[in-house]
Every structure is written in C-alpha cells, then in structure tokens.
C-alpha cells in the first residue's frame, strides 16, 4: 500500500532524524538534567556539606542604581548569617546613592561603601569596582551579586556557605528574573534558565567553564593568587565569566541550586538592556578555555539539523502520500518535545521559576540559537574598541 511505502530518501531522512534525536537525548539526559539530579540528591541527603559558617564579605557593584539599592539591599543586610559584611562600591553619581548608603550605615553596622574614582584609567570601571571591593573585604570568602538582584530568602548566604569546604574555592549559584508579562521577559527568562542548565550542568559534571556575577562566591586568596583580572585587563567585561573560566576546576568548584539560594532580577523593561548584556557575554565567550563551548555549539548544530530533518521527512513523505513515514518523522519530534519539556520544566520547578514552558517551547528552541548568532554577529561588526576597557 502506498501509505505504508518507504523510498530510499525517506529511509535516509528517518535514520538521520533518529541519530540526531539520540544525540539530543544524550545532551538533555546527561547534561541539562544535572540540576534536577543534584536537587534529588540534596533532598535525599546524599550530598556532603560543610557544617561551618565562616565569616564572609558580600560585594555589590552599583552604577547609579539608588532605586535598586532601596529595593534589594535590606534583604541582603538582613540575611540569617552569623558574621558577614556588605560592601557596596558605587560607580557614577554620588548624591542620592551616597545619602541612602550613609543612612543605611547608621542602621547596619556591617554595611560599608566606597566609590570608583572618576579619574580611574587603564582598567574597566566594573573590574576596578570589584577589585576595590575585594581589597576592602575583611574576610576570605567573597560573595558577589549586583544591585538589581534580590535573594529569594534570608537563607541565601547559609546555603552558599554550606558549600565552603576545605577544598572549595568557587561556588556557582543561580540567578533568574522575577516574573514579568512581556514577550521580552518570557524570552529572557527562558534564555536565563537554559543558559544556567548549560553552565551549571557542566560544573555539576566536573567541568566548570563560566559563572555569572549575580550569584557567585570565591576566595579572596584565590583572586590574589591569580593576580586578579590581569589575564584580561584590557577587556571591559570578564569580571565574572572569564575569571571563573580561569580559576574553576573539577576539584575546587561546587554548585548551589536550592531555590532558597536563588537571586532574582527585576523584569527587563527594554530590549536594548538585554541585548547589551548578551553582546557583552558573547564578546568574552570566544576567549573561554576548554572544549565546553564547542560541545555546546555541537548541541545547537545538532538541534537545528534535527528540526530540518524531521520537517523534511514529514513534508517529503506527505507529498508522496507515505503517511507512515510522515507519522514516524512527526513522532520523533514529539518524543524530543516531551523529553525536552520534562527536563526544562522539572529544572524550572527545582529553581522555583514561575514560568513553565510548553506551547512556546518549540519557538524558543529555534529562536535561542538564532539570537545567539545575532549577538555574535553584533560582536563581529561592532567597533572592537567598544569591548575594551573604559
């Protein structure tokens, strides 16, 4: 019967789709699922945590962000932690921010603030702000976050600190967005989650390659042993991802994914802000050491090939009225969609993300690599001086 017939081209397309589906399954089940596996282990008490709570310094770099400081700084200062200090390095206008920080210092004895000199040269202002904060820190353990970030709970520091074992020098945490309603926010929230599934997944697999400075801890001694940001001092960016890429190893890095240890950012208001952030990370990603970005690039490549293969299979088979072949091709798409939706949404639940991704998932699945290509093209055609220190 014609409906159950196969021709050679359709057989090749079905086989190619099946191989690409297997490749995708390996990525999702062996890499992207690791946050969920870690959460299950933590729930069963199968992970070893330190019982000590060493003193630590929280460092926040703010750039003309008095409203963000008003909104988020009290939640950081009121963490349930025995001994910690908060150091705010203010870059930009000093009037309102300076007044607010001085006012808070009268209420919180563990709050200190300083500023980036207007005359600073030869280093990016963000890296200088981080360096000033680290130099001012009294304690060895440093926790990095940003003024637009708010901890989900007062246990944030305790949960990070339970990973401060004798061998640990770097702890990677998760940062996401507060729930917003716009299309921009849905895209950014998915991108933030999927990016975390990649870099935290690799770290949990023993191959850390980057971190994000909104929820990141490392030792002050490690920073100075590595001579700070000297390896990429000429770049504006890299104070978080390039530094982690430089210092993080299998035996000195841990990951904290408890939902109470998550920090949240305000919903994005302008596409421009998100674009500039993504372009900034794209400009430094090409400098990462290790094979991780190539491995992830192959996942993206195999993903796009998979979609091309199953669509070609269904269309060609339908044109020939080979409905069995068309059904098999579509079933391979359905299988991957179900697997992908389960892994992504279970991970979102583990991280207390408010969004669940179902109907929009196929759109984001295609849109995400196209967006990444767009950021890379921006980097390619922009004036290279834009990425150098200012």
Per-region residue spans from a language model:
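N-terminal membrane-anchoring/stem segments of glycan-assembly enzymes
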Residues: 1-50, 340
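Short, well-formed alpha-helical segments that are part of the catalytic scaffolds
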Residues: 40-43, 65-78
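Cell-envelope/extracellular polymer assembly enzymes that use nucleotide-activated donors
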Residues: 54-57, 85
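Acidic donor-binding segment of Leloir-type glycosyltransferases
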Residues: 73-120
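Long helical/loop segments within the catalytic core of UDP-sugar-dependent glycosyltransferases
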Residues: 108-125, 129, 133, 159-230, ...
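Short beta-strand-to-loop acidic/aromatic patch adjacent to the donor-nucleotide binding site
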Residues: 139-150
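Catalytic donor/gating beta->alpha subdomain of glycosyltransferases that bind UDP-sugars
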Residues: 164, 170-195, 221-224, 228-293
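Membrane-embedded multi-pass helical conduit in multi-pass membrane proteins
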Residues: 300-385
């Amino acid at each position: 019967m014609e409906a159950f017939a196969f021709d050679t081209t359709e057989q090749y397309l079905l086989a190619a789709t099946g191989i690409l589906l297997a490749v995708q399954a390996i990525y999702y089940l062996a890499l992207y699922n690791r946050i969920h596996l870690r959460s299950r282990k933590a729930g069963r008490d199968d992970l070893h945590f330190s019982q000590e709570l060493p003193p630590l310094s929280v460092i926040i770099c703010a750039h003309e962000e008095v409203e963000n400081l008003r909104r988020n700084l009290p939640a950081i200062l009121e963490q349930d932690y025995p001994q910690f200090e908060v150091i705010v390095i203010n870059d930009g206008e000093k009037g309102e921010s300076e007044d607010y920080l001085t006012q808070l210092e009268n209420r919180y004895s563990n709050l200190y603030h300083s500023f980036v000199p207007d005359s600073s040269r030869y280093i990016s202002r963000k890296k200088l702000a981080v360096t000033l904060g680290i130099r001012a820190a009294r304690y060895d353990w440093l926790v990095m976050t940003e003024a637009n970030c708010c901890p989900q709970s007062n246990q944030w520091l305790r949960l990070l600190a339970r990973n401060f074992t004798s061998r640990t020098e770097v702890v990677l945490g998760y940062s996401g967005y507060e729930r917003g309603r716009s299309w921009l926010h849905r895209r950014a929230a998915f991108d933030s989650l999927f990016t975390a599934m990649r870099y935290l997944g690799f770290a949990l697999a023993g191959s850390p390659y980057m971190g994000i400075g909104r929820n990141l801890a490392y030792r002050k001694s490690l920073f100075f042993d590595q001579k700070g940001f000297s390896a990429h001092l000429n770049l504006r960016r890299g104070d978080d991802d390039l530094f982690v890429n430089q210092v993080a190893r299998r035996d000195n890095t841990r990951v904290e994914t408890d939902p109470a240890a998550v920090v949240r950012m305000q919903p994005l208001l302008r596409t421009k802000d998100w674009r500039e952030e993504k372009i900034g990370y794209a400009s430094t990603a090409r400098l990462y050491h290790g094979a991780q970005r190539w491995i992830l690039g192959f996942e993206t490549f195999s993903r796009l090939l998979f979609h091309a293969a199953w669509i070609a299979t269904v269309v060609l088979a339908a044109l020939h009225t080979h409905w069995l072949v068309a059904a098999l091709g579509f079933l391979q798409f359905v299988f991957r969609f179900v697997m992908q939706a389960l892994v992504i949404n279970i991970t979102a639940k583990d991280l207390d993300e408010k969004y669940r991704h179902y109907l929009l998932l196929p759109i984001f699945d295609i849109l995400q690599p196209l967006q990444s290509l767009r950021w890379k093209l921006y980097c390619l055609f922009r004036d290279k001086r834009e990425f150098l220190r200012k």
